[in-house]
Amino acid sequence: MTSAAAGLFLVAPAGLSPLLAARLGALLQRRLLDPLPGSAQAPEQQLQQLLDLPGGWLQPLAVDPASDVSERVPASCWAELLGAWRFRTCLLVSEEDRRSGRARSQVVLLQHYKVPLLGVVQCGGPWQPHARRRDGLPWLGWLADDQADPVEALEEEQELQRLLRLRLGPAGL
C-alpha cells in the first residue's frame, strides 16, 4: 500500500476515550477526526479517504487494535490493517494497562503487523521515567490526570508534545 504520513492514528487497549483523543489533539494542535468505529462496514474505503485529507489529522480508533475487522477485509484485526496501510500510530495506555502487561502485549501486536508505532503514552497514574526505561517499551511520555502535581504535569506534557512533533516530522505537522 502507501505510506500514510499525513496523519496519526491513536489506539488504546479496549479503544480510545474521546476525552483523551481531544486532549492529545489540543496538545498537538491537530484536527481531531470522529472516532473510527471498529464495526466499520467498509474500513478500507474509510482508510483510503484518510489518505486524501490534508495533513495534520488525528484519527482515534474506537476499538482495541486487536479487534476483528469486517469479514469483507482480508486483514484479521485492526493492527494488521493499520500496518498494511502504513498508518503512523500512537498507543495510549493507562497505569493499569502498564502494570497488567496489556501495554507490552499491544506494542508486540503492533510491531508484529509492522505498524509504524511512534511510541507509547501513559495516561494518568504516577509517572516514573526511570522505571519506564527499564520496561523496554518505546515510551514517549505521560499525560497526567487531575491528581498530579500541576507543575510536573505541565513539564511532562511539554516534553511529550516536543517528542511527538519530532517523531511526526515536518510532513506530519
Regions found by a protein language model. Name each.
Residues 1-26:
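Walker A (P-loop) phosphate-binding motif
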Residues 2, 23-42, 55-59, 122, ...:
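C-terminal accessory "lid"/substrate-recognition subdomains
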Residues 16, 41-45, 99:
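Alpha-helix capping and helix-coil boundary motifs
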Residues 24, 47-57, 103-108, 173:
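Charged, low-complexity, helix/coiled-coil-prone segments
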Residues 62-163:
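Conserved catalytic-core segment of NTP-binding enzymes
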